[in-house]
Amino acid sequence: HKGDEHTLVIRARGKRTGTDYLRLGLNLSDDMEGDSAFNIGASYRMNGINRLGAEWLTRLQIGDQQELYTEFYQPLDVGSRYFIAPYAAIESQNVEAILDNDPVAEYRLERYGFGLNVGRQIGNSGEIRFGVGEAWGKADVRIGDQSLPSESFNEGFYQLKYSFDSLDNVYFPHAGEDIGLAFRQFEPELGSDQRYRQWEFKLDKALSFGPDTYVLGGRYGRTLDQANVVTSSFLLGG
């Protein structure tokens, strides 16, 4: 408002919009042959960080498979379906060394990495990402012949990922599915010790029968070329 002698200027500051989410989880497994594992995890997602709708996800897990992961999801424009997503990760897990289909030792594998993905949302439930990443780490003998050498490694890779999530509830879904498909190409030109390819598929499906609901899921991963068994191993269901 402007009077004869004074001017009142009001500058409104927008409030950060969006709802933050905290999730907790527990995973227990047993192979009925004396080998069991547990994991406790938590994730925190901050939404609406800036006017473009950026999100910041941080995930922590302790137990048999330890992980610290953080990712910043940044849309490229208001209402844009395109985005970039830089990330960093630290993980540690137990991996068996296999000889003639029999385990000969168990290693403790530590990996540190970072990368950048560029992607696009597909409808309201899907997205596709393409990116590059780099990781390095070491593997020390935990159980078995202590004279076996420790291993250090470097990884550099391209990756292509597709995901589709139509579950109707994050915690207790009654319908829908969660699908993920990922392909990685490890290349010496990106700093990798070896050249090889990997792909992984996951599926969780919610089925309801009257008052009862079942969630069925599966994971499958495969290394397509010759590679170091310890450092390239999958750990499914963690």
Name every feature range the model reports, one short phrase each.
Residues 2-167, 236-238:
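Gram-negative/organellar outer-membrane beta-barrel architecture
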Residues 7, 21-31, 146-151, 155-238:
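C-terminal outer-membrane beta-barrel translocator/porin domains of Gram-negative envelope proteins
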